[in-house]
Amino acid sequence: PLEIEELEDGDKAVTLDKYQTKPTRITDDELYSLSYDKKATVIERHKEAISEKKYSRAIHAIAPNENSTATPVILTSGEASEGRKIMTRKDIVRLKKLFDKNKVPKAGRCLVLCSDHVADLLENDQKFYNQYYNAESGKINKVLGFEIYEYDDCPYYNATTLKKVAYGSVPADTDMQASIAFSPTRMMKANGSVKTYASEAKNNPTTQENLISFRTYSICLPLKNEAMGAIVSAKVTASAGDNK
């Protein structure tokens, strides 16, 4: 008979991050006179604000802290342009090889490109340009096995030490933005319920205004310090020459 194998498992306590919006004032006069539903618009904007903050913190959390064998952080290697080296397909190939070497699951690999790197590939890689968008699915096509996404608020790294800049910090002159790669199967996320805080105008006789805000809890983290990678824009000094 085959030997029976036990799978060790258990619960782990995780503290979720809190996200909340400041109350927005909507007067009864506005609701009466405006031609659109301002309350619905305000609610939508609050939801968008919370989502933007959650996504920003999540991409930072699942980006490697620094370069290591298990979490490779590499520099772009293309031509110099506007103080940095552009991203090329070769950079993605290099990261793919490192993921393969680390036995990162091939299924579902994601690469989130910062805006500079998207522009680099669109302007300089005809193949990427041609297969960038799938009109039928409405999605960006895969590149070298990676599901491709775009995000403007990708984290920054020190271009020399390849260490990640702390979340919320203002990037220094030594810091450059990165594109982030990861395996979703090695990440975790948890979302709490959304709570609405609202006071109606009928309960505010002196101001006759409605107030509304929201609060929720969420977190996104790597399960282990592995299956993550980053491609950081290499910094080019003025003496190296800027050819574009």
Language-model-detected regions and their locations in the chain:
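Long, contiguous amphipathic alpha-helices that act as assembly "spine/axial" helices in icosahedral shell
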Residues: 9-71, 100-115, 148, 197-198, ...
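Exposed alpha-helical structural elements
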Residues: 58, 91-94, 207, 227
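Short, polar loop/linker segments at the starts of domains and inter-domain junctions
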Residues: 1-4, 46
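Sequence/fold signature of self-assembling virion shell proteins
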Residues: 3, 7-16, 80-87, 124-244
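General "foldedness" signal
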Residues: 28-30, 38, 56, 60, ...
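Extended, solvent-exposed, turn-rich assembly/linker loops in the middle of proteins
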Residues: 68-139
